[in-house]
């Protein structure tokens, strides 16, 4: 375990009641402050269970989960952990609790007992950061799915978290909604140093992470940078997972004899490397 880790999982196992086998089995990982970690896995792999363990919604059957220095096994620290590690769920409608946007953002602060005079600027700042200020007095049901998720992010941001856990937060959104939510969380990660645990089944989202964990049958099977993980094309297929489109295309072109390097994730990567192969004199200048 890294001594400076923001989130640490130490030989963590978790078994649901009456389940024949553990959902997670002896998982160990360390997430550093400011890292953006993507977690991939097929349905039932254990990735959502991992999210709930980090947020102290679940307590491990074995092992320890430590968030910002707090062990989730200590019941007295649960609310402190949840203040520091905010969670965005899959369905935005399931986390809207008020009839006005600014009141929804205030909900978590009220539970923390934050004084009104401190609450108001924190709400305004949070909505400003996620670009939702003009909807402050709107009814949440009038918003798009992406806008609702940004309101949920504002509610977390107002509590000044160290960690954001997104449990398939873009799964129910259209492409434009997915883009705006990912861009918002990535911006918070880069400008405020908030650590992000981004659970997704969209490979292009995972390709933007600093590091990727791939979970299958409750165990971490692959770990590394997006380029390192997605270069295991055949192993990913064996785990019933895709890779980014450009990574898959590069793999097919290599099989046809084109000498492309590994680590191709985006259209820009592909264009650059194909140009090097087809026009070596041009790429050298």
Residue ranges and their predicted role:
Residues 63-73, 81:
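Conserved ABC transporter NBD signature motif
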